[in-house]
């Protein structure tokens, strides 16, 4: 396991997470994605590209009463090992992270097709004008030989028919994401994330239901900050209290 790491807290110290001092570290994106999952009453969850485990740890905390079985797939073995350590330190015995390269496919990663009720993912992306100087962080955010289409197709293969896929990504990726899901998943629910009023959305949260033909829905926008720069009341309920988006509507 990595010897140089920090212990940090999420959800107002409900979750203790261990992260590398240098390299990929969890952001608010992870907490927002975990809060977007709705309607779960039990079953199996797959976290693709699990990083430091922040998304699934936050989700496990919120869904504790349903005892979700969560599997995390992570390309960097040291992050998978550190995530398992975090899970045990938080008392979660039904979360397991494994080293996996999803570019190889489901079979090669011991992922049975159509076997998960929910798939969650923060797919890699590249901020073309802001390359990361850190190799670990760059790996987490950008697979140069593995595009968003292949990533989401892996999600579609892993989830059960009519199971749900939850992702967070750059706002400008919305047209591509909708194109990839077209004919394969429907009932899209799209939530735009804004830093403040009168600013463009930087992130989008999307829920897609495999094989569904239901129409797309645009949800009310979400603002993370107030005009004075502090977290909005709604954001505090998610980032600190650990509530889901459904709980604050």
Show where each model-derived region lies:
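Mobile active-site "lid"/loop adjacent to the S-adenosyl-L-methionine
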Residues: 123-150
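Conserved Class I SAM-dependent methyltransferase catalytic core
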Residues: 146-201
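Residue-level signal for inorganic ion chemistry
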Residues: 33, 122, 151, 208
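Conserved beta-strand segments of alpha/beta enzyme cores
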Residues: 16, 69, 94-96, 186-189
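Class I SAM-dependent transferase core
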Residues: 2-40
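Short loop/edge segments at beta-strand edges and connector loops
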Residues: 19, 99-100, 169, 192
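Conserved SAM/SAH cofactor-binding pocket of Class I
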Residues: 36-132
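SAM/dcSAM-binding transferase cores
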Residues: 200-249
């Amino acid at each position: 396991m990595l010897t140089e790491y920090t212990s940090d807290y999420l959800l107002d110290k409900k979750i203790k997470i261990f992260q590398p001092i240098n390299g990929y570290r969890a952001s608010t994106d992870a907490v927002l994605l975990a809060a977007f999952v709705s309607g779960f009453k039990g079953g199996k969850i797959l976290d693709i590209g699990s990083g430091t485990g922040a998304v699934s740890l936050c989700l496990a905390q919120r869904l504790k009463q349903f005892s979700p079985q969560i599997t995390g797939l992570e390309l960097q073995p040291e992050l998978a090992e550190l995530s398992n350590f975090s899970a045990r330190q938080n008392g979660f015995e039904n979360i397991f992270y494994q080293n996996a390269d999803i570019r190889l496919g489901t079979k090669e990663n011991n992922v049975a097709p159509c076997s998960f009720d929910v798939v969650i993912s923060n797919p890699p992306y590249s901020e073309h004008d802001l390359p990361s100087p850190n190799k670990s962080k760059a790996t987490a955010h950008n697979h140069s030989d593995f595009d968003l289409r292949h990533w989401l197709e892996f999600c579609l293969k892993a989830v059960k028919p009519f199971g749900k896929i939850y992702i967070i990504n750059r706002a400008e990726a919305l047209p591509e994401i909708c194109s990839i899901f077209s004919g394969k998943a429907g009932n899209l629910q799209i939530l735009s994330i804004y830093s403040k009023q009168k600013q463009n959305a930087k992130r989008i949260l999307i829920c897609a239901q495999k094989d569904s033909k239901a129409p797309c829905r645009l949800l009310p926008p979400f603002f993370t900050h107030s005009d004075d720069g502090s977290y909005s009341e709604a954001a505090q309920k998610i980032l600190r209290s650990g509530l889901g988006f459904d709980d604050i509507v």
